[in-house]
């Protein structure tokens, strides 16, 4: 039985000119949109993984992590190469000062989207729920 895997990433948000935009990446293999994330290496913490993967996939290093936001989702994965295994993905929330253009060899496309557009692009309910919680957390800070 293949070993369970862990991954981590960020819900990245840029707030400029009164608008809140979220970064989404479109997977080049299966076309689904999601947040920057990747698998953990060795003994990395989820935060270390999220920082490394975000830097590798987006080039963005100027992040302000929002304290207290951490969401994990565990689900079954089946691939021809690895077989069936359990994967746990942890997401953190961070701001970045500008909506930088992102190019990644792992992704077919990328973009910064408002909440409604981002929610429509996210195909997986767990990612939609993560986005919803991120939006609520950001609104709560202002209140």
Language-model regions, residue ranges each:
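Conserved N-terminal beta-strand and adjoining loop/helix that marks the start
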Residues: 1-21
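Short, charged/polar surface micro-motifs in flexible loops or helix N-caps
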Residues: 17-19, 29-31, 41, 71-76, ...
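Conserved Nudix-box catalytic region and its N-terminal flanking loop in Nudix hydrolases
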Residues: 18-61
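Short aromatic/basic micro-patch
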Residues: 34, 86, 112
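Active-site segment of metal-dependent pyrophosphate-handling enzymes
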Residues: 59-99
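NUDIX/MutT-family hydrolases
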Residues: 91, 95-132
């Amino acid at each position: 039985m293949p070993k369970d895997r862990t991954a981590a990433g960020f819900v990245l948000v840029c707030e400029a000119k009164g608008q809140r935009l979220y970064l989404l990446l479109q997977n080049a293999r299966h076309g689904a949109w999601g947040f920057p994330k990747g698998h953990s290496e060795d003994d990395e913490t989820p935060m270390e993984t999220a920082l490394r993967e975000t830097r590798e996939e987006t080039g963005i290093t100027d992040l302000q992590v929002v304290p207290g936001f951490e969401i994990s989702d565990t689900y079954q994965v089946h691939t021809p190469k690895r077989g069936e295994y359990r994967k746990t993905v942890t997401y953190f929330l961070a701001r970045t000062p500008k909506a930088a253009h992102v190019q990644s060899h792992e992704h077919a496309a990328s973009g910064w989207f408002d909440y409604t557009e981002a929610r429509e692009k996210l195909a997986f309910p767990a990612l939609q729920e993560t986005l919803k919680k991120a939006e609520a957390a950001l609104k709560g800070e202002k209140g």
